[in-house]
């Protein structure tokens, strides 16, 4: 979204993870950021969904009253796509992806953190919106091991675990 680069896309589905005060060297304030995300969501054709994090007030405010179908995901609020039976195995999230109260997929992530559960729910929401079966989501998310330099385990040094996380 930096410098409004995402406004040059032609999305058939839009996913908005969060809208917060970021890149303030370019954007004036949160309202300016929300305006850009709304413009991005408006690029989606009428039949295409706009998938939004219901747990992020900035994202929800950005799409309030928008015409394309809004499909929500989240953990802390009632949303179209949620996680049920959330547990951890070796510190990594395992949960059922629920779409409007129905189990869609059972997900075992290989990345850590609450934010990655939300990212997985966003990906599952997009997959569902595009008509993909739940087993494709299970396979795809199980194979994801993270983005480079985002909490990337590099090894052990004198008994201490070493991670690279540029953000």
Tell where the protein language model's regions lie, with residue ranges.
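Switch II (G3) loop of P-loop NTPases
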Residues: 1-2, 162-167
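Acidic, Mg2+-coordinating active-site environments of NTP-dependent enzymes
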Residues: 7-162
